[in-house]
Amino acid sequence: MGTSVSKPVSDDKKKGTSVSKPVKNIVLVGRSVNGICTTGNNILGQNKFGSEGAFMHCQMYSTTTPDGQMINVIKTPGMFDLSVSEDYISKEIINCLTLAEEGVHAVLFVLSMKNRITQEEEYALNTLQRIFGSKILEYLIFLLIDGEKFEAKEFEDYFPECCPEFLMRVLRFCNGRKVLFNNMTNDEGVKAEQVNQVMAHVAAISKKNDEKPYTEDMYRNIKVNTFFSLIAFI
């Protein structure tokens, strides 16, 4: 399979919107490409992701929040699909990090609450760590979609009961960073509040990491260190 990088010019740049804050690059990952696209569109406030032929490639679109925060939203393909080759995944990871020129400020792991969380999600999380290194967990936020039937408080009571131990372990490491994200709502206030919750977590991650994003150099160092570790083991 060939790879391509889609980097459209944002509508905000076209309009000449003044941006008063440093750009934040957020990457959407998960098992369901449809879920990733819908979530990305809701963060953008526009239907941008999901165009024909784009599902298997990284794409980036931009938006600016009312308070002047520019956000680059990067959609990844279904990188945790067992039918996708390791070589293809590696190339798309590089494409993703190329799009995030200043580095990745947060990784949003999109999880559907429609069905029981299974070993396939565990495999996806393990794949994420194997590709990016355990350092990526410091930038991880869980977006829990398809939970429209829940109110926030009700969900907080329900979630520990349905959450498997592997996910609880990762959540503890991530300081419990999760957002119940309603992709079906037409309420603009709810939409704005969801994005605000996500960006509050992004700000907390940046503060904890001394404003240092995850960069392509970090990724390449992880690959080099892994290689030499394997050589030493042999």
Curated annotation (Swiss-Prot):
Q: Name one GO biological process term.
A: endoplasmic reticulum unfolded protein response
Supply the alphabetized keyword list: GTP-binding, Nucleotide-binding
Which domain of life does the UniProt lineage start with?
Answer: Eukaryota
Instruction: Choose one Gene Ontology CC annotation of this protein and give it.
Output: plasma membrane
- Signal among keywords: no
Among Pfam families, the record links this protein to: AIG1 (PF04548)
InterPro entries, per database record: G_AIG1 (IPR006703), GIMA/IAN/Toc (IPR045058), P-loop_NTPase (IPR027417)
What does its record list under induction? Up-regulated by brassinolides. Down-regulated by 2-aminoethoxyvinylglycine (AVG), high CO(2), isoxaben, and propiconazole treatments.
Q: The AIG1-type G domain covers which part of the protein?
A: 21-223
Q: What Gene Ontology molecular-function terms does this entry list?
A: GTP binding
Keyword Isomerase on this protein?
Answer: no
- Which tissues show it? Mostly expressed in pollen. Also detected in lateral roots and radicles.
Q: Which family does it belong to?
A: Belongs to the TRAFAC class TrmE-Era-EngA-EngB-Septin-like GTPase superfamily. AIG1/Toc34/Toc159-like paraseptin GTPase family. IAN subfamily.
This chain's protein is named: Immune-associated nucleotide-binding protein 2
**What species is this protein from?**
Arabidopsis thaliana
Whichever gene encodes this chain, its name is: IAN2
